[in-house]
Amino acid sequence: MLFSPPLQRATLIQRYKRFLADVITLDGTALTLHCPNTGAMTGCATPGDTVWYSTSENTKRKYPHTWELTETQSGVFICVNTLWANRLTKEAIQEDRLPELAGYNILKSEVKYGAERSRIDFMLQADFRPDCYIEVKSVTLAEKENGYFPDAITERGQKHLRELMGVAAAGHRAVVLFAVLHSAITRFSPARHIDIKYAQLLSEAQNKGVEVLAYKAELSATKMELNKSVPIML
């Protein structure tokens, strides 16, 4: 997926109030960007890092510029806009880049399901096959080459795993897909040191038939593409 129009470059001064970030552009202009990430963003928002941002054509937006990528001072790319995890996953499914999810001719988004009244990110359907429910999670927390999710305790994520176990018990396919949006990560694990309950639920879910996938995106300031399976260590 190409960034169109091209992203613009700036230097990060600070992220604050979760949804805002101050930057300095190449010509020295000070801007405040919208930060579309509610997580801790550990390692993704170090002052002095390069920020790549987009600009909305909507003139009514209070903050028309959106922080899309971080390029660290060591050259690592991280996608901080969590909306891209679903966009890249959808594109990869439609282009048959995820072999585990190939062979379906109908793709639906934000379908209501489950005992806890959730919405699944994607549902795949095809004749003579069980429906496939897919929950997507964005992975940006890294320690060396290890990627972790979540980066903070996530009751919502725990709920999604319970819902997926219900889907599997009903005879459908249930999938949690971890979209790795950090160029230095080469393997994935649940973040036991942050949310032990989520890690325990993920292991339980896998034992009860939920499929656990992890795919990494190729990242640059011009394009992103989810295309590489990475090892999972539960």
Curated annotation (Swiss-Prot):
Keywords: DNA-binding. CDD domains: SfsA-like_bacterial. GO terms for molecular function: DNA binding. The keyword Glycoprotein does not apply. Residues 201-220 bind DNA. It comes from the Bacteria. Binds to DNA non-specifically. Could be a regulatory factor involved in maltose metabolism. Belongs to the SfsA family. This is Sugar fermentation stimulation protein A. It comes from Salmonella arizonae (strain ATCC BAA-731 / CDC346-86 / RSK2980).
